[in-house]
Amino acid sequence: CDLATSDVFTVNVVADPVIDTQAIASQEVCRNTTVAQLEITVSGDNNTGAFNYQWFVNTTNTNSGGTLVGTNTNTYTPDNSVVGTFFYYVVINQTASGCEVTSEVSTIIINEVPTITTQPIGSDICLDGAANTLEVVTENGVGTPTYQWYASTTNTYDLTNPIAGETNSTYTPPTNTVGEVFYFVVISFDGGCSDIQSTIALVNTVAEPIAT
Protein backbone atom coordinates (compact mmCIF):
# COMPACT_ATOMS: atom_id res chain seq x y z
CA CYS A 1 0.00 0.00 0.00
CA ASP A 2 1.09 3.51 -0.64
CA LEU A 3 1.92 5.66 2.37
CA ALA A 4 -0.72 8.19 3.35
CA THR A 5 0.38 11.66 4.39
CA SER A 6 -1.70 13.83 6.69
CA ASP A 7 -2.21 17.50 6.38
CA VAL A 8 0.22 19.72 8.26
CA PHE A 9 -0.92 20.92 11.65
CA THR A 10 0.62 23.96 13.26
CA VAL A 11 0.95 24.02 17.02
CA ASN A 12 1.62 27.48 18.36
CA VAL A 13 3.05 27.39 21.88
CA VAL A 14 2.64 30.69 23.72
CA ALA A 15 3.77 31.78 27.12
CA ASP A 16 1.43 32.43 30.01
CA PRO A 17 0.57 36.05 30.68
CA VAL A 18 3.08 37.89 32.84
CA ILE A 19 2.15 40.13 35.77
CA ASP A 20 4.41 43.15 35.41
CA THR A 21 3.17 44.96 38.52
CA GLN A 22 1.63 43.25 41.52
CA ALA A 23 -1.07 44.87 43.64
CA ILE A 24 -0.07 46.56 46.89
CA ALA A 25 1.17 43.87 49.28
CA SER A 26 -0.68 45.00 52.39
CA GLN A 27 -2.60 47.85 53.94
CA GLU A 28 -4.28 48.46 57.27
CA VAL A 29 -7.21 50.85 57.65
CA CYS A 30 -10.17 51.58 59.89
CA ARG A 31 -13.62 50.28 59.12
CA ASN A 32 -15.50 52.46 56.61
CA THR A 33 -12.42 54.48 55.66
CA THR A 34 -10.72 54.52 52.27
CA VAL A 35 -9.00 51.34 51.11
CA ALA A 36 -6.46 51.79 48.34
CA GLN A 37 -7.50 50.16 45.09
CA LEU A 38 -5.77 46.93 44.15
CA GLU A 39 -4.31 47.15 40.65
CA ILE A 40 -2.10 44.93 38.53
CA THR A 41 -0.56 45.32 35.09
CA VAL A 42 -0.24 42.33 32.77
CA SER A 43 1.51 41.63 29.49
CA GLY A 44 1.33 38.68 27.11
CA ASP A 45 0.70 37.51 23.54
CA ASN A 46 -1.97 39.77 22.06
CA ASN A 47 -2.84 37.10 19.50
CA THR A 48 -4.30 34.79 22.12
CA GLY A 49 -7.20 36.97 23.16
CA ALA A 50 -8.04 39.61 25.70
CA PHE A 51 -7.13 39.26 29.34
CA ASN A 52 -9.86 38.09 31.69
CA TYR A 53 -9.66 38.87 35.39
CA GLN A 54 -11.18 37.09 38.38
CA TRP A 55 -10.60 38.59 41.83
CA PHE A 56 -10.91 36.36 44.89
CA VAL A 57 -10.90 36.93 48.65
CA ASN A 58 -9.74 34.42 51.25
CA THR A 59 -9.71 34.25 55.03
CA THR A 60 -6.34 32.46 54.86
CA ASN A 61 -3.11 33.66 53.29
CA THR A 62 -3.24 31.72 50.04
CA ASN A 63 -3.82 32.49 46.38
CA SER A 64 -6.08 29.55 45.67
CA GLY A 65 -9.74 28.97 46.42
CA GLY A 66 -11.74 31.66 48.16
CA THR A 67 -14.78 33.65 47.09
CA LEU A 68 -15.08 35.35 43.71
CA VAL A 69 -15.65 39.07 44.32
CA GLY A 70 -14.82 40.86 41.06
CA THR A 71 -14.33 40.27 37.35
CA ASN A 72 -13.47 41.91 34.02
CA THR A 73 -10.98 44.53 35.18
CA ASN A 74 -7.38 44.75 36.38
CA THR A 75 -8.46 46.78 39.43
CA TYR A 76 -10.52 45.97 42.49
CA THR A 77 -11.46 47.99 45.57
CA PRO A 78 -11.76 45.79 48.67
CA ASP A 79 -14.73 46.01 51.02
CA ASN A 80 -14.10 48.23 54.04
CA SER A 81 -17.24 47.56 56.09
CA VAL A 82 -16.28 44.36 57.92
CA VAL A 83 -13.58 44.13 60.58
CA GLY A 84 -10.99 41.41 59.99
CA THR A 85 -8.00 40.32 57.93
CA PHE A 86 -8.66 39.45 54.30
CA PHE A 87 -6.42 38.09 51.54
CA TYR A 88 -7.06 39.08 47.91
CA TYR A 89 -5.61 37.75 44.69
CA VAL A 90 -6.51 37.75 41.00
CA VAL A 91 -6.38 35.08 38.30
CA ILE A 92 -5.73 36.33 34.76
CA ASN A 93 -6.35 34.16 31.71
CA GLN A 94 -6.66 34.41 27.94
CA THR A 95 -9.56 32.31 26.74
CA ALA A 96 -8.21 31.70 23.24
CA SER A 97 -5.12 29.93 24.54
CA GLY A 98 -6.13 28.76 28.00
CA CYS A 99 -3.01 30.37 29.41
CA GLU A 100 -3.31 31.91 32.86
CA VAL A 101 -1.35 33.39 35.73
CA THR A 102 -2.20 34.01 39.38
CA SER A 103 -1.12 37.08 41.32
CA GLU A 104 0.50 37.27 44.71
CA VAL A 105 -1.70 37.83 47.78
CA SER A 106 -2.64 41.32 48.98
CA THR A 107 -3.41 41.46 52.70
CA ILE A 108 -6.10 43.90 53.81
CA ILE A 109 -6.61 44.49 57.55
CA ILE A 110 -9.81 46.30 58.56
CA ASN A 111 -9.75 47.56 62.15
CA GLU A 112 -12.59 48.78 64.30
CA VAL A 113 -12.89 52.56 64.47
CA PRO A 114 -11.20 54.19 67.48
CA THR A 115 -13.17 55.03 70.58
CA ILE A 116 -12.41 56.82 73.83
CA THR A 117 -12.84 54.53 76.83
CA THR A 118 -11.77 57.05 79.48
CA GLN A 119 -13.00 60.63 79.17
CA PRO A 120 -11.58 63.74 80.90
CA ILE A 121 -13.38 64.67 84.12
CA GLY A 122 -13.89 68.28 85.16
CA SER A 123 -13.66 69.62 88.69
CA ASP A 124 -13.93 72.64 90.95
CA ILE A 125 -10.53 73.85 92.14
CA CYS A 126 -9.50 76.58 94.53
CA LEU A 127 -7.35 79.36 93.13
CA ASP A 128 -3.74 78.18 92.80
CA GLY A 129 -4.77 74.74 94.03
CA ALA A 130 -3.61 71.41 92.63
CA ALA A 131 -5.75 70.66 89.60
CA ASN A 132 -6.91 67.18 88.70
CA THR A 133 -5.16 65.83 85.62
CA LEU A 134 -7.41 65.46 82.58
CA GLU A 135 -6.88 62.13 80.84
CA VAL A 136 -8.15 60.17 77.86
CA VAL A 137 -7.67 56.50 77.01
CA THR A 138 -8.43 55.13 73.55
CA GLU A 139 -8.80 51.71 71.98
CA ASN A 140 -8.84 50.44 68.39
CA GLY A 141 -7.76 52.61 65.48
CA VAL A 142 -4.73 52.26 63.23
CA GLY A 143 -1.30 53.65 63.93
CA THR A 144 -0.03 55.82 66.76
CA PRO A 145 -2.53 58.30 68.19
CA THR A 146 -1.57 61.95 68.54
CA TYR A 147 -3.29 64.40 70.86
CA GLN A 148 -4.09 68.10 70.88
CA TRP A 149 -5.79 69.72 73.86
CA TYR A 150 -8.01 72.78 73.47
CA ALA A 151 -9.35 75.38 75.89
CA SER A 152 -12.49 77.46 75.51
CA THR A 153 -14.50 79.93 77.55
CA THR A 154 -17.70 78.38 76.20
CA ASN A 155 -19.07 74.85 76.39
CA THR A 156 -18.41 74.19 72.70
CA TYR A 157 -15.87 72.40 70.53
CA ASP A 158 -13.96 75.56 69.68
CA LEU A 159 -10.94 74.55 67.60
CA THR A 160 -9.48 78.05 67.42
CA ASN A 161 -7.56 77.83 70.69
CA PRO A 162 -5.20 74.82 70.78
CA ILE A 163 -3.04 74.74 73.91
CA ALA A 164 0.58 75.05 72.79
CA GLY A 165 2.70 72.00 73.54
CA GLU A 166 -0.12 69.94 75.04
CA THR A 167 0.03 66.88 72.80
CA ASN A 168 -0.16 63.99 75.25
CA SER A 169 -3.03 61.87 76.50
CA THR A 170 -3.02 63.80 79.79
CA TYR A 171 -3.19 67.51 80.59
CA THR A 172 -3.05 69.37 83.90
CA PRO A 173 -4.87 72.71 83.59
CA PRO A 174 -3.61 75.86 85.32
CA THR A 175 -5.48 77.20 88.35
CA ASN A 176 -3.98 80.68 88.65
CA THR A 177 -7.04 82.51 87.30
CA VAL A 178 -10.56 82.48 88.70
CA GLY A 179 -13.20 81.37 86.22
CA GLU A 180 -14.59 78.56 84.11
CA VAL A 181 -12.56 76.98 81.34
CA PHE A 182 -13.79 74.15 79.13
CA TYR A 183 -11.24 71.61 77.93
CA PHE A 184 -11.31 68.83 75.36
CA VAL A 185 -8.83 66.88 73.26
CA VAL A 186 -8.79 65.90 69.58
CA ILE A 187 -7.13 62.57 68.82
CA SER A 188 -5.71 61.80 65.38
CA PHE A 189 -4.39 58.52 63.98
CA ASP A 190 -1.61 58.21 61.43
CA GLY A 191 -3.23 55.13 59.90
CA GLY A 192 -6.04 57.08 58.25
CA CYS A 193 -8.78 56.73 60.85
CA SER A 194 -11.02 59.73 61.36
CA ASP A 195 -10.21 62.12 64.20
CA ILE A 196 -12.19 61.72 67.41
CA GLN A 197 -12.98 64.25 70.13
CA SER A 198 -13.33 63.75 73.85
CA THR A 199 -16.21 65.04 75.88
CA ILE A 200 -15.81 68.55 77.25
CA ALA A 201 -14.53 68.87 80.81
CA LEU A 202 -15.29 72.00 82.84
CA VAL A 203 -12.58 73.15 85.22
CA ASN A 204 -13.97 75.84 87.53
CA THR A 205 -11.34 77.74 89.47
CA VAL A 206 -12.81 79.61 92.45
CA ALA A 207 -11.35 82.08 94.90
CA GLU A 208 -10.44 80.98 98.39
CA PRO A 209 -13.11 81.96 100.91
CA ILE A 210 -12.18 84.92 103.09
CA ALA A 211 -12.77 84.60 106.81
CA THR A 212 -14.60 87.52 108.37
Question: Predicted regions: what is each one?
Answer:
Residues 56-81, 151-175:
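Surface-exposed, flexible coil segments in extracellular/virion-facing regions
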Residues 1-2, 93-99, 188-194:
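Short, solvent-exposed loop/turn segments at the edges of extracellular beta-sandwich modules
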Residues 88-89, 183-184:
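Hydrophobic beta-strand segments within extracellular beta-sandwich modules
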Residues 15-25, 112-119, 207-212:
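Proline-enriched interdomain boundary motifs that mark the N-terminal boundary
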Residues 33-44, 129-139:
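A short beta-strand segment in extracellular, disulfide-stabilized domains
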Residues 9-15, 107-112, 201-207:
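Interdomain boundary/hinge segments at the C-termini of tandem beta-sandwich modules
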Residues 44-57, 139-151:
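Solvent-exposed loop segments of extracellular immunoglobulin-like
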Residues 24-30, 121-126:
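Short beta-strand segments of immunoglobulin-like
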